[in-house]
Curated annotation (Swiss-Prot):
Comp. bias intervals (Basic and acidic residues): 153-167
Classification via PROSITE patterns: SHSP
Protein name, as recorded: Alpha-crystallin A chain
Xref: SUPFAM superfamilies: HSP20-like chaperones
Family annotation (Pfam families): Crystallin (PF00525), HSP20 (PF00011)
Subcellular location: Cytoplasm; Nucleus
Keyword Glycoprotein on entry: yes
InterPro entries, per database record: A-crystallin/Hsp20_dom, Alpha-crystallin/HSP_16, Alpha-crystallin/sHSP_animal, Alpha-crystallin_N, HSP20-like_chaperone
Binding site for Zn(2+) 3: H154
Residues bearing the modification N-acetylmethionine: M1
Length: 173
């Protein structure tokens, strides 16, 4: 019986096409040269591998924190203004949608859109939810938690996004 053995170089060369990259949370960052030519970057050396850590840091990922007394979502939306963002609470979910129409930048024209949906814990007081956008583009959605047994109130409503003039105090991953 013959067994085909695949050299690790082939896996690295096809890396950008594997499903593990499907869930990257890119919000339309500019393309780098190696994004356009993924095969050339992996053929430099069989031991060369692009740093995934840098990719994660630059990807606009979100962070969700649920402490004893509050629930907080941090989301990097540096390419969007408060007018481009919509934050809604629908029953036990918060939906964050961002969209800006086509506009010109240094490399041509670009439009961006994203949609995020997070489940709210059942003990979050939905009447006291707040959302703000810091000067450095960090969206902070937060709400206090109520003690067990107290009705947290579940209804559909829009949460206004307020602009802060200072940079975010969110931790950098």
């Amino acid at each position: 019986m013959d067994i085909a053995i695949q050299h690790p170089w082939f896996k690295r060369a096809l890396g950008p096409f594997y499903p593990s990259r499907l869930f990257d949370q890119f919000f339309g960052e500019g393309l780098f040269e190696y994004d356009l030519l993924p095969f050339l970057s992996s053929t430099i050396s069989p031991y060369y591998r692009q740093s995934l850590f840098r990719t994660v840091l630059d990807s606009g990922i979100s962070e969700v924190r649920s402490d004893r007394d509050k629930f907080v979502i941090f989301l990097d939306v540096k390419h969007f203004s408060p007018e481009d963002l919509t934050v809604k609470v629908l029953e036990d979910f918060v939906e964050i949608h961002g969209k800006h129409n086509e506009r010109q930048d240094d490399h041509g024209y670009i439009s961006r859109e994203f949609h995020r949906r997070y489940r709210l814990p059942s003990n979050v007081d939905q009447s006291a939810l707040s959302c703000s956008l810091s000067a450095d583009g960090m969206l902070t959605f937060s709400g206090p938690k109520v003690p067990s047994g107290v009705d947290a109130g579940h209804s559909e409503r829009a949460i206004p996004v307020s602009r802060e003039e200072k940079p975010s105090s969110a931790p950098s991953s």
